[in-house]
Structure formats: structure tokens, C-alpha cells
């Protein structure tokens, strides 16, 4: 109580921040009259004037009032829109690297222009991040009018652009694009072989629109570039049939809250027996160690059938399983579930099963956006997640006041016992609203529920529009016209829709939709005037009816999504109303103990069709939602700790890779690698302080043959009186250096430098790809360490570091081995440019695409493991060429590199297969 009184007297921290911005607003308003009288040319000259001030040492904060006033005047002249004072404050919040929470309809898109223009004056580039291509194109064209008028260049990154177009867009002062495109371009750039081929500039400043959707809802989902792995289509089909025909109710246990399902003991026995019958299981125990892969695929088939529902979690479109985003209801084209789950869903639905893939590069949005020195964001709903924004991203949230008071009436929830009673009440309300010409927006949590409600309305002959992932293309137009008199619009989650619902209808959308074929001229002007009059008249009708009525058919597990739905009504001081209709059969109610409530309602004598309405129920639901939000925050925080381990390693690898590309030559690096490999080779065979008879000269001789490609008299050297390991290291080093000097003399220094650089990059990429796979495997089982009273995170850090050191050692060895064996044919006058890796861009898991590993031009140096490099015969003929490897003759395999696939065809690395015996 006293806290509330104190806040009323002195204001909270947010109020004080907003109050502090008003002084700057007054300064900007004082400049406005001076700019009104300027000609367009004079106003445009202010951009150069502001840049000159920056060049002379002033800061962005110093020029902020003049820059904001300039943008405001330019917006009036180009768009016919003037920034309100609260919008100016929103621009200041963005400029200082914070998140501005602004209600729907407060003009977030226009607010961004202020901070974007100011920061773009430095010439380092500003990125504006949106949630889909439509908004990126719309905003870059719409707001781009302001920037171009003021002499700044604008680029737009959308799907389907080639590298030249992307490079030009990133070179612009301001670049609009989606979070996916920015992230994938970063990963692709770090797979390029020349700096000139990269498309992005160094990061400077990013403003993220719908920041809660991108940095929280999608934070757990990594961006992945991948290439194909083994084909297991027949296994998925077989296991799908086993689960479909064998597993019945009672054979499995399901935990909806944890989204987990597992076989019971009886179910396990039935599945194991069926697997033996079809020959997939050789023994009666499904959980034997050698059946671990089979168990994994059985579990994924079980999840596909018992946890994932068509038209709720995914839809089937064009012979593909397409994931539906649980927060926005959008189709996530190109995104796939990981670890074989997507293939299990494809088998379940009978569509073409795409091959599993191996990760080539990946990053989460959490770590991608933390690469920007300055980051800001905008959204209508961020305060509920303010703690997470601060803890993970260091981004404070400022709740901006509205330009006009909010007049929307948020009514208490109505709770019914069954879903049928709930839908009957919703339809009654819709009919009442239509009778008074009040538009209704109905929010559902899934496609299935939206189509169910649509069927009810069809039976009642109520005209309506349905907006869900199936009709993505018409999305913007349907939303824009949802404010017309009597309109009924059913929409899956409204998060991130990006288009305002304007009462009476949306002028721009109607012009675009109805007059697209009408050329400029008097006839078009008359048609526009007619549409404008129709919208004005329609708005009056809607205002008298009470504005837009928002109906929620279920509570989402996140309060933020519910608030976004409510926020569609009551924009810019318009009247409106909102109400949620719930039933005890809803997911959130069922998961959080609706059985007890059902018993209580029956005792109270609640009749069919009656609802219980009380603020206590609202509070109880909000508490349940708060618990879920806290749980999800903990999951994201924990995942980030693990991803940070890989992120630190990623930074090192990408930085080293860029240094290699930037260097004129890498001779010193490969020489250093060669010397380290020789030292390690000798140290393994001749341990420190060991007696001569303890030296493993046979092993050393074989390693010298394999790595250096020469039959050197190592055993004879070891027998020499008084020889030490340092002497052997020196002789091997001298031999290797002389051999490389001979190659340089034969092929020329320029060609050798190109070969060294090309090989180092290619082998680094291959090693990094293998390392990512190893980290994936490590991550999957690391939580089991908790049973041994060990901290899984510390274990993961320790072992991941060990794997990283192993990767670097393997990199040094492979680079040395390949360079010692390399022969350049005379036809190779010019070394071809290394091929760019080809990979599928996916969310969460790989999708099918050719790997591109075989796409090297003829004449490119190749290696015997059929990857990128193949040694030609060395010197006077010690090493056989790759073509002499015979699959059935293990004796011919002895010079196969240790990390290459074994020639026997097992799929294992040579060092883990036939290479073990050496």
C-alpha cells in the first residue's frame, strides 16, 4: 500500500526516464518552425551539415535535436505524417540502445526513422530487423521515402537475392531485412574463401521490430546451414508402421506440460517383439547399448504420433511437412525439427522423407544479436519480459506513454465447463456485435481451432474471414480490413502481424487492392476520393458501435501473446473492447489442474451454458502464466549457457578464418603447423626421459610415412649412439622444410602460397563441421552426468574444450599431410577458386540439399578420402595415388589420412576402423 502511494507521489523509474526525455522534445519542437520555411533542397542539405558536425568531433547526442527535427520535417513532406512528441521520445529510447514498448497503432515504424537516420549519419550502416519479407519490403519502400529524400541510401534483404544484390544492400546507409536473412548471411560469410566475396559489413547498430518475438520466442531456435548425411528413409517408414500398428493407449505415458512421451514397460515389450519380427532388432533387449540409434528413432516416431498434431503443430503442403510457429501461427518455411523428428513426421504423413543432415554452421539469435555493438528494439509488449531482456541482452525496457489515452475496455474472462459451451457463447457474442455493425477479431491458438470456429459460423451463415498459416499470402489485406463495419475476422495468434487494424478500413490497402490496374489521372483521383469518403463514413459507424471487439478463445501460456491480441483494439485513442472465453478443456486450464476446478463448479451448481466470471479467476490464470513464463525463461537461460561454450569457440574459428583470408600468404602459419606436428609425432613415439629401448620406432616410422610421405630411415637414426629425440625432430623438420622448398621451386612461390591458403581454409571448414557434430553428440547425453553427482554444464565446458583442442591438432596434422603429398599437374596453370559450400538454410535442423563437396573444378587438388583433396604420387613413388586404392585390399589403404572415411565403406573414420590396427 505504502509502495503504491510512494509511486503515485514520486513516480517509478520508468516515469523518471520518460520525464527526462521531455527536455529534448522541447528542444526539437523549438527547431521545427525554422525548418518549415526551408525549401526541399535546403532541408536536404542538412544531412551534409550534420555529417560535417560529426566529422569535427561532435557526438550523435550533440546533433540529436537537429537530426530528429530534420526527419520530422522530411516525414511531413514525403509521407504527410508528423512525429508526435511521444514518438520523438521513442526515437531517443532506441538511440540509447533500449527497448521501447509502444502500444499497437502508436506508429513504431515511423518512430524507428528517427534513430535510424541519426545513427546512419556515421556511415557505418544501420540494420532494421523485421519478422518477415513482406514487412521488410513494405517498410524499406515506405520509410525509405524519408531517407532517400534526405540523401541516404536504403537496401532491403529478402529471400532469393544473389550475393551481388546482398552486398549492395548491406553497403547502403540503412538496410532492412528479416532476422533469418541477417543471421544466415553472417553464417554464409564465414564460409566464404575471399574477403571480397563476403556481403556484410562490420556490425554497428540494429533496431529489432517485434523484439520480443525475435529475441525471446525464437531465441531457442538456432539458424543452421547444413549438408546431407546418410539416407535412413526406409528405417523411418518401418518404425512409423511399428508405432502406428503396435502402440495403443496404455502402452505409453505422456506429460503435456513437459512435452514428453515414453513407452511403458508393456509398450516396450510389444515394440521390441515387433522389431524382432521385422528383423530390425537382433536381440530381445531393445535397450542394449548397440541399439541406441534404434531406440532414438523409435522414440521420435512415438513423439510424432502422440505429441504432434496435424494443423496444430504443423501442416502438410506441397508434399512437405511445414512447421507452424506456436507464437504467431505462421508457416515456418524451411525450418525443420532436429534429430530425426521431422523425418518421423514425414513418415507419419506419407510425404517424401528428406535426408537427415549434418550441421555446417549454426548460431542462435541470442548470440547473433549480441554481436552488434549497439542494439535496440520496439514492441507493443515487452514489460512482462523486462527481466529477461536485461539479464541476457543488457537491454532495459522503457514503457512509452500513448499519444492519446487508451479507451479499450478489458472485460473479465468467462469460464465454461466445456469447449462446446464456450464456442456457443462466442458465436452469440459475434452475432450481437454484427447486429450493431461492430467489427470482431477472434484470436485462436491453432489452425485447427480457427477452422472449427469457422465451421460453426458457416452453419450460422455468418460471413467471416479466416487468417492462419494456410492463407499467409492474403494476411496483410485481411488484417487491414478487419475494422470495417460488421467484419468478423478469425486469426491464429496475432503476434508480429505488423499491419494495423484501422476502424472503417485501411485506405492504402484498399487503393492497392482495388485500383492497382487504374493508371494515374483524374479517374484514379476520383476513385481514391470515393474510397476515402467510404472509409470515413464506415469509421463513424464503427465508432458508434463501440470500436473493434477482440475475442480470445483461449489463454496462451504467455501473457505477452494475450496482451498482443488485446492490443489490436483501442489504437490511437479509439474505443474498443476485449474478452477471453475459456473452458476447462483448454490446454492451459487442463495442464494446470482444471479437474479440481471442474469438481468445484459442479458443486456450485453451474448449469450447462452458464459461465463463471470473477477477477479471482483472472488472477489465478495470470499466476499460472507467470509460472510458465518463468519456466521457459529458465530453459532459455540454461540453453544460452551451453550455447555460449560453442559461441566462444565459434568466435575464435571465425576470427582466425578471417585473418587467413585477410593475409597475403599463410606460409608462416603452415610452417609453424608442420613443425608442431613433427614435434607431436616424435613426442608420442619417444616419451620424455624414456630409454632408447622404450622408443616406439615402428610407430614413428609409420607416422612419418603417413604424414610426410617418405620412407625415412627413422629406425636407423634411433640406433645411433647418443642420439636424442631433439635430433630426430630436427632431421624430420629439415627434411620436411627442404621438401616444401623443392615444391616451391618447381611450382613457383605464387602458386604455392595460393595452395596453402586454399587448403588451410578448406580443411578448417571440414574440421569445424566435424567439431560441431561432436559437440551435438556431447550435448545430447551430457545431462546424464547429473546422476553421477557432476554438474552437466561444467562437464560440457571441460569436454568441449578438449574436443576443440583435438580439432586444432587434427587441423595441423591434415594441413601438413596434404601439403607434403600435394602434386600440381602441369595443366593447372591457375589454381581455381575454392568452391563455396552449398547448404540448406534451416531453422532448428538441416534440410536436404546437395553438399557441394564434389563440385570442385577438374584439376583442383584433391584428397584420398573423396572430400576436397587427393594426393598425387609423391617424389620417386613412395605414395600410391588415390586411384590405386582397392576396396577389397586393405594393404593398399595404409596411407589413407586418419580422419578420412575408411575405404572399407563402413562410414567410420579410418582411425576408428581399419586404421586402429596399425
From Swiss-Prot:
ATP binds at residues 87, 105-109, 500. Its EC number is 7.4.2.8. Pfam families: P-loop_SecA, SEC-C, SecA_DEAD, SecA_PP_bind, SecA_SW. Its main location: membrane. It is a peripheral membrane protein. Residues 876-918 are annotated as: Disordered. GO terms for molecular function: ATP binding; metal ion binding; protein-exporting ATPase activity. GO terms for biological process: intracellular protein transmembrane transport; protein import; protein targeting; protein transport by the Sec complex. It is found in: Cell inner membrane; Cytoplasm. Residues 908-918 have a biased composition (Basic residues). May bind 1 zinc ion per subunit. SMART domains: SecA_DEAD, SecA_PP_bind. It is an enzyme of class 7 (translocase). Its cofactor is Zn(2+). Zn(2+) binds at residues 902, 904, 913-914. InterPro entries: Helicase_ATP-bd, Helicase_C-like, P-loop_NTPase, SEC_C_motif, SecA, SecA_CS, SecA_DEAD, SecA_motor_DEAD. Part of the Sec protein translocase complex. Interacts with the SecYEG preprotein conducting channel. Has a central role in coupling the hydrolysis of ATP to the transfer of proteins into and across the cell membrane, serving both as a receptor for the preprotein-SecB complex and as an ATP-driven molecular motor driving the stepwise translocation of polypeptide chains across the membrane. Belongs to the SecA family. Monomer and homodimer. Part of the essential Sec protein translocation apparatus which comprises SecA, SecYEG and auxiliary proteins SecDF-YajC and YidC. This is Protein translocase subunit SecA.
Amino acid at each position: 500500500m505504502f509502495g503504491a502511494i510512494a509511486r503515485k507521489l514520486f513516480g517509478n523509474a520508468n516515469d523518471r526516464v520518460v520525464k527526462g526525455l521531455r527536455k529534448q522534445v522541447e528542444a526539437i519542437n523549438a527547431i521545427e518552425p525554422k525548418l518549415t520555411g526551408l525549401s526541399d533542397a535546403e532541408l536536404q542539405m542538412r544531412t551534409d551539415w550534420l555529417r560535417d558536425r560529426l566529422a569535427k568531433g561532435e557526438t550523435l547526442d550533440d546533433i540529436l535535436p537537429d537530426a530528429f527535427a530534420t526527419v520530422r520535417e522530411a516525414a511531413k513532406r514525403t509521407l504527410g505524417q508528423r512525429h508526435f512528441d511521444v514518438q520523438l521520445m521513442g526515437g531517443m529510447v532506441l538511440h540509447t540502445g533500449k527497448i521501447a514498448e509502444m502500444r499497437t497503432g502508436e506508429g513504431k515504424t515511423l518512430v524507428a526513422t528517427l534513430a535510424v537516420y541519426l545513427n546512419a549519419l556515421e556511415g557505418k550502416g544501420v540494420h532494421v530487423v523485421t519478422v518477415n519479407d513482406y514487412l521488410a519490403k513494405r517498410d524499406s519502400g515506405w520509410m525509405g521515402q524519408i531517407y532517400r529524400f534526405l540523401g541516404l541510401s536504403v537496401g532491403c534483404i529478402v529471400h532469393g537475392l544473389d550475393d551481388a544484390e546482398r552486398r549492395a544492400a548491406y553497403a547502403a546507409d540503412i538496410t532492412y531485412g528479416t532476422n533469418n536473412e541477417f543471421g544466415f548471411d553472417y553464417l554464409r560469410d564465414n564460409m566464404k574463401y575471399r574477403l571480397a566475396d563476403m556481403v556484410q559489413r562490420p556490425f554497428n547498430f540494429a533496431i529489432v521490430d517485434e523484439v520480443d518475438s525475435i529475441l525471446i520466442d525464437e531465441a531457442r531456435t538456432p539458424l543452421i546451414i547444413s549438408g546431407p548425411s546418410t539416407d535412413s528413409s526406409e528405417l523411418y517408414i518401418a518404425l512409423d508402421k511399428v508405432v502406428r500398428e503396435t502402440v495403443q493407449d496404455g502402452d505409453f505415458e505422456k506429460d503435456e506440460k513437459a512435452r514428453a512421451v515414453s513407452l511403458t514397460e508393456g509398450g516396450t515389450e510389444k515394440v521390441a517383439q515387433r522389431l524382432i519380427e521385422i528383423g530390425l532388432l537382433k536381440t530381445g533387449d531393445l535397450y542394449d547399448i548397440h541399439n541406441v540409434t534404434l531406440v532414438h528413432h523409435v522414440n521420435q516416431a512415438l513423439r510424432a504420433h502422440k505429441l504432434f498434431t496435424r494443423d496444430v503443430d504443423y501442416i502438410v503442403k506441397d508434399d512437405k511437412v511445414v512447421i507452424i510457429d506456436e507464437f504467431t501461427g505462421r508457416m515456418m518455411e524451411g525450418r525443420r525439427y532436429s534429430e530425426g523428428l521431422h523425418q518421423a513426421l514425414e513418415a507419419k504423413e506419407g510425404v517424401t522423407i528428406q535426408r537427415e543432415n549434418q550441421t555446417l554452421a549454426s548460431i542462435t539469435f541470442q548470440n547473433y544479436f549480441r554481436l552488434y555493438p549497439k542494439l535496440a528494439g520496439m514492441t507493443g509488449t515487452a514489460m512482462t519480459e523486462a527481466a529477461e531482456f536485461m539479464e541476457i541482452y543488457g537491454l532495459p525496457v522503457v514503457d512509452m506513454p500513448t499519444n492519446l489515452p487508451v479507451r479499450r475496455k478489458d472485460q473479465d474472462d468467462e469460464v465454461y465447463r466445456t469447449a462446446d459451451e464456450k464456442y456457443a457463447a462466442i458465436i452469440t457474442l459475434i452475432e450481437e456485435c454484427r447486429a450493431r455493425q461492430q467489427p470482431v477479431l477472434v484470436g485462436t491458438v491453432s489452425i485447427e481451432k480457427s477452422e472449427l470456429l469457422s465451421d460453426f459460423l458457416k452453419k450460422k451463415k455468418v460471413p467471416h474471414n479466416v487468417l492462419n498459416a494456410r492463407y499467409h499470402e492474403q494476411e496483410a489485406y485481411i488484417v487491414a480490413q478487419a475494422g470495417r463495419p460488421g467484419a468478423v475476422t478469425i486469426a491464429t495468434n496475432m503476434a508480429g502481424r505488423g499491419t494495423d487494424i484501422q476502424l472503417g478500413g485501411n485506405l492504402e490497402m484498399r487503393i492497392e487492392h482495388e485500383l492497382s490496374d487504374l493508371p494515374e489521372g483524374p479517374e484514379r483521383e476520383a476513385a481514391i476520393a470515393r474510397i476515402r469518403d467510404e472509409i470515413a463514413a464506415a469509421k463513424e459507424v464503427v465508432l458508434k458501435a463501440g470500436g473493434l471487439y477482440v475475442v480470445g478463445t483461449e489463454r496462451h501460456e504467455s501473457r505477452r501473446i494475450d496482451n498482443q491480441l488485446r492490443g489490436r483494439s483501442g489504437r490511437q485513442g479509439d474505443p474498443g473492447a476485449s474478452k477471453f472465453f475459456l473452458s476447462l478443456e483448454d490446454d492451459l486450464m487442463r495442464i494446470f489442474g482444471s479437474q479440481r476446478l471442474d469438481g468445484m463448479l459442479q458443486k456450485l451448481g453451474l448449469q450447462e451454458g452458464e459461465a463463471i466470471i470473477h477477477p479471482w479467476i483472472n488472477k489465478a490464470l495470470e499466476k499460472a502464466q507467470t509460472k510458465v513464463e518463468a519456466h521457459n525463461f529458465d530453459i532459455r537461460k540454461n540453453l544460452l549457457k551451453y550455447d555460449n561454450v560453442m559461441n566462444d569457440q565459434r568466435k575464435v574459428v571465425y576470427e582466425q578464418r578471417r585473418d587467413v583470408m585477410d593475409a597475403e600468404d599463410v606460409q608462416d602459419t603452415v610452417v609453424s603447423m608442420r613443425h608442431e606436428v613433427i614435434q607431436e609425432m616424435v613426442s608420442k613415439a619417444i616419451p620424455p626421459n624414456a630409454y632408447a629401448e622404450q622408443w616406439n620406432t615402428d610407430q614413428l616410422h609409420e607416422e612419418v610415412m603417413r604424414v610426410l610421405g617418405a620412407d625415412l630411415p627413422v629406425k636407423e637414426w634411433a640406433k645411433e649412439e647418443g642420439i636424442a629425440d631433439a635430433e630426430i625432430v630436427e632431421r624430420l623438420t629439415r627434411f620436411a622444410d627442404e621438401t616444401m622448398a623443392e615444391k616451391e621451386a618447381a611450382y613457383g612461390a605464387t602458386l604455392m602460397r595460393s595452395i596453402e591458403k586454399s587448403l588451410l581454409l578448406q580443411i578448417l571448414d571440414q574440421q569445424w563441421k566435424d567439431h560441431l557434430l561432436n559437440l551435438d553428440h556431447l550435448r545430447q547425453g551430457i545431462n546424464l552426468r547429473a546422476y553421477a553427482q557432476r554438474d552437466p554444464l561444467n562437464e560440457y565446458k571441460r569436454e568441449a574444450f578438449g574436443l576443440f583442442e583435438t580439432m586444432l591438432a587434427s587441423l595441423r596434422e591434415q594441413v601438413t599431410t596434404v601439403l607434403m603429398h600435394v602434386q600440381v599437374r602441369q595443366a593447372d596453370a591457375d589454381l581455381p577458386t575454392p568452391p563455396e559450400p552449398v547448404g540448406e538454410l534451416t531453422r532448428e535442423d538441416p534440410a536436404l540439399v546437395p553438399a557441394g563437396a564434389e563440385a570442385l573444378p577438374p584439376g583442383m587438388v584433391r584428397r584420398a578420402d573423396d572430400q576436397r583433396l587427393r594426393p598425387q604420387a609423391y617424389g620417386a613413388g613412395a605414395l600410391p595415388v588415390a586411384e590405386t586404392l582397392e576396396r577389397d585390399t586393405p594393404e593398399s589403404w595404409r596411407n589413407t589420412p586418419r580422419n578420412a572415411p575408411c575405404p572399407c565403406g563402413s562410414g567410420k573414420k579410418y582411425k576408428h576402423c581399419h586404421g586402429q590396427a596399425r
